[in-house]
Amino acid sequence: MLAKRIIPCLDVRDGQVVKGVQFRNHEIIGDIVPLAKRYADEGADELVFYDITASSDGRVVDKSWVSRVAEVIDIPFCVAGGIKSLEDAAQILSFGADKISINSPALADPTLITRLADRFGVQCIVVGIDTWFDAETGKYHVNQYTGDESRTRVTQWETLDWVEEVQKRGAGEIVLNMMNQDGVRNGYDLQQLAKVRAVCHVPLIASGGAGTMEHFLEAFRDADVDGALAASVFHKQIINIGELKAYLAAQGVEIRVC
């Protein structure tokens, strides 16, 4: 069985790491490179960087920091933000990123997933899905351009349908960003994760809601996700990655202990 992964997420805006709640009201956390190094040293399995306004601004991720991150960490990392072409992806990978993630551009042009997978291999193509639970309808809907709250919009896709669609098109991994839980630290949406897990046959990463070590355990044990992504609990040093992994290992989770 493959080891479960602990993945700190670094949202990047204007060259700094920021963090919001439910994708809004972002506060500055700090500089990119020192944070990346700290997480690698603590035992993170990989890192994810989101240039959160790249897609809504109509630009590609700011590449200036990608190579600097690659110089100071020795774990895999994934970069996302406005990647709309093979050329964009090739440049980011050439700067040292191990994976690229697409979200809003995939919704705008789903063929991009296939073209990227054919060119670079499915193993380095991640599709991020920003999903919102509508309490009135009881349905999960995919949102687009979530990095800028003034431009965020609900798409015509229901989450489970989009999960199936991106797999058909060549997604090698899916990160499910559960917007209702984002930054609230009340736990992952296990019900939604279980529904997605039932139709997701590639690695599935849970994102949004981690507040305690038990929340990570629940995601691995009850929803059978392959990785758990979190931000604020690591940024604010509420949870230490090394201690988290020791806890999970003691609970019987297959994990790489530092």
Swiss-Prot record:
Keywords: Amino-acid biosynthesis, Cytoplasm, Histidine biosynthesis, Lyase. Pathway: Amino-acid biosynthesis; L-histidine biosynthesis; L-histidine from 5-phospho-alpha-D-ribose 1-diphosphate: step 5/9. It comes from the Bacteria. One of its GO terms (molecular function) is lyase activity. The keyword Repeat does not apply. Its main location: cytoplasm. It is found in: Cytoplasm. The active site is at 11, 130. GO terms for cellular component: cytoplasm. InterPro entries: Aldolase_TIM, His_biosynth, HisF, IGPS_HisA/HisF, RibuloseP-bd_barrel. Its EC number is 4.3.2.10. It catalyses: 5-[(5-phospho-1-deoxy-D-ribulos-1-ylimino)methylamino]-1-(5-phospho-beta-D-ribosyl)imidazole-4-carboxamide + L-glutamine = D-erythro-1-(imidazol-4-yl)glycerol 3-phosphate + 5-amino-1-(5-phospho-beta-D-ribosyl)imidazole-4-carboxamide + L-glutamate + H(+). Belongs to the HisA/HisF family. IGPS catalyzes the conversion of PRFAR and glutamine to IGP, AICAR and glutamate. The HisF subunit catalyzes the cyclization activity that produces IGP and AICAR from PRFAR using the ammonia provided by the HisH subunit. NCBIfam families: hisF (TIGR00735). Heterodimer of HisH and HisF. This is Imidazole glycerol phosphate synthase subunit HisF. The gene is hisF.
